[in-house]
Design a protein with these regions (language model features):
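Conserved, mostly hydrophobic/aromatic
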Residues: 82
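Residue-level "edge-of-site" marker
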Residues: 85
Length: 141
């Protein structure tokens, strides 16, 4: 299970609406054991994918990942996952998402339809990398 505050949920939804018709993306910082984790902070990332591909792909550069690792250390948190939006597509992982994901992390996907944030889901990639499993996403007040 992944737990988000209402504030963090709102930040993700606003990022998805602002980036539309392109994908937004970012990194989730949090605490917890391997099963249940709580997101305490996030780091919005500028989608580094070439502009013609941003409507259906996102890219977080190695430099951004290093900066996020350093930020996590300063905050005494872990990188627990990532978020991105799917403009005008379901809030479910694509084959591209599976090919570029790593087990152990949470992957929040936000459906943005015609610029309006809709369904938000959480996924984890199986160790075999054959498929994602849906995870419970809890929003705290």
């Amino acid at each position: 299970m992944l737990v988000l505050s209402k504030t963090i949920e709102t930040e993700i939804r606003e990022a998805g609406a602002k980036a539309y018709p392109n994908e937004c993306c970012g990194i989730l910082f949090g605490t917890g054991d391997g099963e249940d984790q709580v997101v305490r902070s996030l780091r919005p990332i500028v989608n580094a994918r070439e502009s013609g591909e941003q409507y259906h792909r996102f890219l977080i550069t190695a430099e951004e990942m290093m900066a996020a690792e350093l930020e996590a250390r300063k905050l005494a948190l872990d990188i627990v996952g990532f978020y991105h939006s799917h403009p005008d597509h379901p809030a479910a992982p694509s084959e591209y998402d599976r090919d570029h994901a790593l087990p152990f992390y949470h992957y929040i996907i936000l459906r943005v339809a015609q610029g309006e944030p809709e369904e938000m889901t959480d996924w984890r990639l199986r160790l075999s990398r054959e498929a994602f499993d849906a995870e419970e996403l809890e929003i705290e007040p």
